[in-house]
Amino acid sequence: MAQRIFTLILLLCSTSVFAGLFDAPGRSQFVPVDQAFAFDFQQNQHDLNLTWQIKDGYYLYRKQIRITPEHAKIADVQLPQGVWHEDEFYGKSEIYRDRLTLPVTINQASAGATLTVTYQGCADAGFCYPPETKTVPLSEVVANNAASQPVSVPQQEQPTAQLPFSALWALLIGIGIAFTPCVLPMYPLISGIVLGGKQRLSTARALLLTFIYVQGMALTYTALGLVVAAAGLQFQAALQHPYVLIGLTIVFTLLAMSMFGLLTLQLPSSLQTRLTLMSNRQQGGSPGGVFIMGTIAGLICSPCTTAPLSAILLYIAQSGNMWLGGGTLYLYALGMGLPLMLITVFGNRLLPKSGPWMEQVKTAFGFVILALPVFLLERVIGDVWGLRLWSALGVAFFGWAFITSLQAKRGWMRVVQIILLAAALVSVRPLQDWAFGATHTAQTQTHLNFTQIKTVDELNQALVEAKGKPVMLDLYADWCVACKEFEKYTFSDPQVQKALADTVLLQANVTANDAQDVALLKHLNVLGLPTILFFDGQGQEHPQARVTGFMDAETFSAHLRDRQP
């Protein structure tokens, strides 16, 4: 019995040993594309569901999903919102993980109609697949007017849009708006109206009435926030379109110009007059009348409040978040009401004296609003140009603040001026690098000199012309993030270049993914990119030396040493 157990253990160990002997050390750790993104479809008359089961550690690009009908007509396809993914070279992109279900409405399909579905994805470990195309056969569908409406796509774990400010900023903005020239001088008058002209109210009573007034104003703003957030939720996909983002950028820029005094934005004077008359008919000093006065006051926008309020509303529309929408506008109204409550309780002695500084506060808010166009444009133009826009905005703001501070006479302002000047110098650095190209020239001096090939025949010819030298073939594509990382961090390393000094360097750019590219990848049995192949002097590949996925310079140098005989 003991002998049998010993024999069984020996067989199991031998099996694992032999498996290890024949297991290629260079075998890819990544699965084929159909396992990474298991695609399936199901049609029921006009309704077609496309599904992707996405393997853990992999993701699909939202912008790379394309659907093209052949001999069929489909409704507009609305892709659900994904989650944001960011990398160094392509900036922010929306991706899908775990599972994606995409409903498609088929308005009409002839016999033999098909749907061509193209998609592309990557692995978190630094490996990207070429664009994959699937052909979906369609059952014949007769045109039906009821099916012509676009499908409402369920939002799969809809994330909150990543916006640059928290709702708490709205409170600070509201307080800041209170010190603009259109608002601050009105507070004593508003305080008198709220109290109904009664001078001998107790402090608690005066504070209560003012608080009720502020809550009425906050109710109006909160309702605006909820409505705009609900509208933004319905049109969330459209709000992410580049043309819409550019349009919003123009609107925000115009709002900022109004804060600089170049434009004037406010409600029509006739409408403001009607709202003011309605407010004046309310009885001051009573809770009900004060609340209605505050509600109406929230609709009366002065030139100083129109631009910030519009900016916050558009900001909320971008989020599509109901809680954020209502909460942000409530805090904004509360911020505007805090100075009024203080004045009502403590009197005008707390008010700072009016002067040019109020115009400077208004101008400063113009720069705050200008930050939103930069944030929106960053999604369209990428992080590189986005950084340059942030740099330009920083230089403009700190430069303006420095010039404005020169009018101050107090000694401690000299310290502030030095800080502002230093901040402007730091902000200008990205623009300086762009203008003089310092970083670019440093990088271009260290690239490897690859010979480009395109087809299988060109590869075979290059292997023959190597004349006994070892050959390295780098498969590259513009859509491959890790390929760019190889270029920037690995191939630029002096140790890597030294190790490849006696190696013939070939590169195949398969960005187009055309028939020749597909044939080359199939011939070499390549799943995705980056993939680097090594051939000996006789033109035979060493499969165990194949590299799939990104390697840093140190790891790649060690890999090159290990492959040497």
Swiss-Prot record:
Q: What is the lineage of its organism?
A: Bacteria, Pseudomonadati, Pseudomonadota, Gammaproteobacteria, Enterobacterales
* Keywords from the named record: Cell inner membrane, Cell membrane, Cytochrome c-type biogenesis, Disulfide bond, Electron transport, Membrane, NAD, Oxidoreductase, Redox-active center, Signal, Transmembrane, Transmembrane helix, Transport
Q: What's the gene?
A: dsbD
One GO cellular-component annotation of the UniProt record comes to:
plasma membrane
Coiled coil segments of this chain: none
Family statement drawn from the similarity comment of this UniProt entry: Belongs to the thioredoxin family. DsbD subfamily.
| Domain Thioredoxin, chain residue ranges per copy | 434-565
Q: Where in the cell is it found?
A: Cell inner membrane
Read off the NCBIfam families from this record. Answer: PRK00293.1
Q: Where in the sequence is the signal peptide annotated?
A: 1-19
Q: How does it sit in the membrane?
A: Multi-pass membrane protein
Record topology, Periplasmic segments: 20-162, 229-242, 317-322, 378-383, 439-565
Topological domain ranges for the Cytoplasmic compartment: 184-207, 264-295, 344-356, 405-417
Q: Which GO terms describe its biological process?
A: cell redox homeostasis; cytochrome complex assembly
Q: Which residues cross the membrane?
A: 163-183, 208-228, 243-263, 296-316, 323-343, 357-377, 384-404, 418-438
Disulfide partners? C122-C128, C182-C304, C480-C483
Q: What is its main location?
A: membrane
Report the source organism.
Escherichia coli O157:H7
The keyword Electron transport appears for this protein = yes
Q: What is its EC number?
A: 1.8.1.8
Q: What does this protein do?
A: Required to facilitate the formation of correct disulfide bonds in some periplasmic proteins and for the assembly of the periplasmic c-type cytochromes. Acts by transferring electrons from cytoplasmic thioredoxin to the periplasm. This transfer involves a cascade of disulfide bond formation and reduction steps.
Catalytic activity field: [protein]-dithiol + NAD(+) = [protein]-disulfide + NADH + H(+); [protein]-dithiol + NADP(+) = [protein]-disulfide + NADPH + H(+)
Gene3D superfamilies on file: Glutaredoxin (3.40.30.10), Thiol:disulfide interchange protein DsbD, N-terminal domain (2.60.40.1250)
What general EC class does the enzyme of this chain belong to? oxidoreductase
Q: What name does this protein carry?
A: Thiol:disulfide interchange protein DsbD
PANTHER family membership: THIOL:DISULFIDE INTERCHANGE PROTEIN DSBD (PTHR32234:SF0)
Q: Which GO terms describe its molecular function?
A: electron transfer activity; protein-disulfide reductase [NAD(P)H] activity
